[in-house]
Amino acid sequence: LTPEGTFLDDMIVYRMAPIHFLLVVNAGNLAKDYAWVSEQVKATGDAVAIDSSSRYALIAIQGPASREVLQPLTGVELADIAPFWFSHGEVANARATVARTGYTGEDGYEIFIPPNMADRVWQAILESGRSADVVPAGLGARDTLRLEASMRLYGNDIDESTTVLEAGLGWIIG
C-alpha cells in the first residue's frame, strides 16, 4: 500500500529464510514493483533487492482435484502445506517450491520451477490429471473464478487511486 492507503499492487511475500524473501507480483507491474521495493530497501541501508523473475516459471493447479493430481508427482507432502505457506522439493523431477496459493478462490498450488523445466512439469501435470479431467484454463476462466471469490486484480478492479476500504478489503489493514 502507498502511504495514502491506496494500492501499489497486489503481491504475495514468501519468507524463504530469516533474511530472504520472495515477492510474487503482478507480471504487468514487475518494473514498477521492483523500482518501489528497491527504493524501500535502499533506504534501510542493510538490504538488497534482486529481480530474480527470469529464474522462475510458475505453474498453478487449482481446484478440488489439485492435490490428487499433484501429489503423485512430488515427494512434498501437500496436505502438510497450510494455505499461503510453501515447501521445497521436486515436482516431476524438477527442483521446485510448491506454495498453497492461487488466484481462483479454490484450493490449489503454485509451483515455482526453473524455466527450462516448465514444459516437463506442465506435461506431467496434464498426464497425472487426465483421469480427473484436468484441462488447461486461460485468463478468462481465472478471472471468472477470482471475481466469484471477490479477489481483486490490479489494473482492473484496483489501482493507485483505489483505497483499501473502497475495494472492500479493510480486513488487510492490521
PLM feature spans:
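Acidic, proline/glycine-enriched N-terminal capping motif
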Residues: 1, 6-8, 140
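Glycine-rich, Trp-frequent "lid" loop and neighboring beta-strands that shape
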Residues: 12
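Conserved, structured C-terminal
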Residues: 16-174
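Short active-site-adjacent helix-start/loop capping segments
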Residues: 8-9, 32
